[in-house]
Amino acid sequence: MIANKYDLISKIGAGAFGAIYKGQNIRTGEPVAIKVEPLKHETNLLKNEARIYQYLKGGTGIPQVKWFGVDDTNNYMVINLLGESLQHNINTYGTFSLLNAIAIGVQMIERIQYVHECGLIHRDVKPDNFLFGLNEQRDRLYIIDFGFCKKCNNPQTTTPTTTPTTAPPKKMTSILGTPNYISISVHDYIEPNKHDDLESILYTIMYLYYGRLPWDTPGITNTEIRNMKQVLLYGAGTATTIPKIFTQFAYILSTYREKSNEPNYKSLLELLNMFTNAK
């Protein structure tokens, strides 16, 4: 029992930080998820994650922290129990129709827009990090795992009458995130910004539709993945090889990346909603 209030029932997941358990509030019977992180971890990932959830509290699709605490051996975080991840859905049930993949994409953009408006960049957008709710929330998408999250760094400045001025982009010494889903810029070791979260959403939508991304090949190099993404989205002839909505999404992203540090969420959402409403 944890905090004289929560019982551990069964292990439902694991990660670099430790383990995730299904639990129950013994006073109310409410099902919960309990993350357990051994204190031997010097980074305190779980404590940082709890702080971020508290900071984002109140946003649609943000897990609710019900309790955080420490004992002699572990950090504990209790949040509302969620359903299956997008990745689990693919593994278990197969791919989504294009219509459903796009509808899920709308929710992903809405979640990321809220995170960005709160001054944060997620930096690890992928199917594992979006979960559906349970029961009456089963159609609502939740965003999780803010281990790579960082405050926004916006080197561009604009005024209504001037062209954006851009400081040299910050370079990284290693790739950050999951190679299948990171942006082309991150493949170039450029520190992620808001646009990169949205580009990762595009690759996630494509994955939901195809079930496998074309660069998901054993032994493929970072440069090869980067070049395949570049050719697929911006190369000649792509309009005949992938659904047009994917190249339209990429065009909006690239256009506004050049103009401003602020993505055009409105245009992206209009594009996806126009597609779903037409079906």
Question: In which residue ranges do the predicted regions lie?
Answer:
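Activation segment signature within eukaryotic-like protein kinase domains
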Residues: 104-105
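Conserved activation segment of eukaryotic-like protein kinases, specifically the C-terminal portion
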Residues: 169-186
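Catalytic-loop of the protein kinase fold
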Residues: 116-133
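Short beta-strand micro-motifs within the conserved protein kinase catalytic domain, predominantly
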Residues: 64-75
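ATP-binding glycine-rich loop module of kinase domains
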Residues: 25-47
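Conserved N-lobe ATP-binding subsite of Hanks-type protein kinase domains
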Residues: 19
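Structural motif in protein kinase domains
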Residues: 82-91
